[in-house]
Amino acid sequence: MKSFIIFSGLIFVIFLSNKYSCQPVADNQYLSSLSENVKVLEQRMYPAMSASSANEEKRFQLEIFGSMAKAEEQRSRYPNPLFFHSWKDTED
């Protein structure tokens, strides 16, 4: 068992020291999150589908940010939703 662990560790070290596995890819950039890694992988695997999914994602983000902007606008109209009724009554 001990020799198996040493042997597998040796193979692992050889694999890590392999110059081809350590070479950076030309377009390798720092990716800050897993979702960006997934997007890059999908673009490389399915280039035709990634273009259409990018358009769908942009549309989805516009919908989300549009609804968030509307919600923020509504929030800015009223100081605190918990005290909305008492606040409205004091202005009348």
Swiss-Prot record:
In terms of superkingdom, the source organism counts as Eukaryota
Query: Cellular component GO terms, alphabetically?
Result: extracellular region
Q: Where in the cell is it found?
A: Secreted
| Disulfide-bond pairs as recorded | none
Q: Mind listing the UniProt keywords for this protein, alphabetically?
A: Secreted, Signal
**What are the TM regions of this chain, as residue ranges?**
none
Signal peptide range: 1-22
Q: In which tissues is it expressed?
A: Expressed by the venom gland.
Report the sequence similarity comment from the record: Belongs to the non-disulfide-bridged peptide (NDBP) superfamily.
Q: What is the name of this protein? A: Venom protein 49.1
Q: Which organism is it from?
A: Lychas mucronatus (Chinese swimming scorpion)
